A protein has these predicted regions:
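An N-terminal, well-structured beta->alpha segment
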Residues: 1-64
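N-terminal small/polar loop signature for handling phosphorylated ligands or for N-terminal nucleophile
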Residues: 42-115, 123, 228-239
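A glycine/threonine-rich phosphate-anchoring loop and its flanking beta-alpha core
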Residues: 111-207, 298-305
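Glycine-rich phosphate/pyrophosphate-binding beta-alpha loops
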Residues: 140, 247-280, 359-363
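C-terminal and late-domain segments of enzyme folds
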Residues: 184-248, 252
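Gly/Pro-rich interdomain helix-loop hinge
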Residues: 271-348
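Short, amphipathic C-terminal "tail helix"
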Residues: 345-382
Length: 382
């Protein structure tokens, strides 16, 4: 079996990594940056260290802080217009998945005709575009180091998943010092998103030894440190360990692929503007229980990684404990336990079925699902 492991050219980790990145980029003389972020992050002062470092190096930049959760193609076009108007030369994304995905989509437009959603699917982006630095503030989507971007086509009310090595940032930055003030609910949702990445990658039909090692260690770290990061956001060790865990999960799914959890989660996220991590967290135990018969031995190893003492258990029993451990962690960090708590009704489901099955994440799922089975999974998640 052959496989590909694509990563950023440079990854910087740890407190102070933002300053290290700026010094590195200064030497490259890329020109003027468009900083793509969310206005709330600016108001919270999270970008102050970035601004100070850029100013110290006398590096030119323009701020685009209009990003919102679940970015749309219209937002991407707005960002690209800002890039052109300011005559920028490269991109710096600052935030979680939404700012980084927006910057990736803008990157597409710097070297390819629009819209960015035209490149939905795998390997359709012909030209790489300008350099991209991705500074991650959540743990998280791992968008700072993956080949994925998710942009909403508002007319069709669908999340378009763009997967291409040309979207991998040139420099990935995980600086835990800018993660300390992320609210508990966001910490919980993004952490469960990272757990979903790791588990889906581990049971994916595309899994291989390199992704297995990364996925299992990611599961172990997230299970251990996510509750601590939720309980005390200023626990720097917990934030750093979660940053490591989500990065390892990104390494795993960037090569092995994802599965039905993401395929199904993208639909309510698009139609109801729900947080991606929450959608994943609600669906994760339900869909992995559906997948379990096709990957019993693998789920037994997931249980071990989540701290379950499986000595004396059969793989079947241990695999069931993996599902229980997922549910326990989800409840522990305060994730809603059903979509009905978020304004979703049974009537919404029918419009999601075909889109979920057509999602690029679906083919790597270890157990194929029919349209009727997808409906039942959604109903169980209400």
């Amino acid at each position: 079996m052959s496989f590909m492991l694509a990563l950023p050219k440079i990854s910087l980790h740890g407190a102070g990594a933002i300053g290290d990145m700026v010094k590195l980029v200064a030497g490259k003389q890329w020109g003027k940056a468009l900083i793509v972020t969310n206005g709330q992050l600016v108001k919270l002062g999270l970008l102050d260290s970035l601004f100070a470092a850029l100013d110290e190096q006398q590096m030119a930049y323009q701020l685009f802080d209009e990003v919102f959760p679940n970015p749309t193609e219209a937002l991407v076009q707005q960002g690209y217009a800002a890039y052109q108007a300011a005559r920028c030369d490269y991109l710096i994304a600052f935030g979680g998945g939404s700012p980084i995905d927006t910057a990736k989509a803008i990157k597409i437009l710097t070297a390819n005709p629009g819209p960015s959603t035209a490149y939905s699917g795998v390997g359709k982006v012909k030209n790489a575009g300008v350099p991209l630095v991705a500074i991650n503030t959540t743990a998280g989507t791992a968008a700072e180091m993956t080949s994925n971007a998710v942009i909403i086509d508002s007319e069709r009310q669908v999340k378009e998943v763009i997967i291409d090595p040309n979207l991998i940032p040139d420099i990935a930055v995980d600086d835990a010092s800018v993660m300390l003030d992320i609210p508990p609910a966001v910490t919980a949702a993004t952490g469960m998103d990272a757990l979903t990445h790791a588990i889906e990658a581990f049971v994916s039909v595309g899994a291989h030894p390199l992704t297995d090692a990364n996925a299992l260690e990611a599961i172990r770290l997230i299970n251990l440190w996510l509750p601590k990061a939720v309980d005390d956001g200023h626990d720097l060790q917990a934030r750093e360990q979660m940053a490591f865990g989500q990065y390892l999960a990104g390494m795993a799914f960037n090569s092995a692929g994802l599965g039905l959890v993401h395929s199904l989660a993208h639909q309510p996220g698009a139609t109801h503007n729900l947080p991606h991590g929450v959608c994943n967290a609600i669906l994760l135990p339900i869909i992995e229980n559906f997948n379990r018969p096709n990957a019993v031995a693998r789920f037994a190893r997931v249980a071990q990684a989540m701290g379950v003492d499986t000595r004396g258990m059969s793989d079947e029993a241990a695999s069931m404990e993996a599902i229980n451990a997922i549910r326990t962690l989800s409840k522990r960090v305060g994730i809603p336990q059903g979509f009905s708590q978020l304004g979703v009704s049974k009537a919404d489901i029918e419009g999601w079925l075909d889109k979920a099955l057509a999602d690029p994440c679906a083919p790597c799922n270890p157990r194929p699902a029919s349209r009727d089975e997808v409906r039942e999974l959604y109903l169980e998640a209400l």
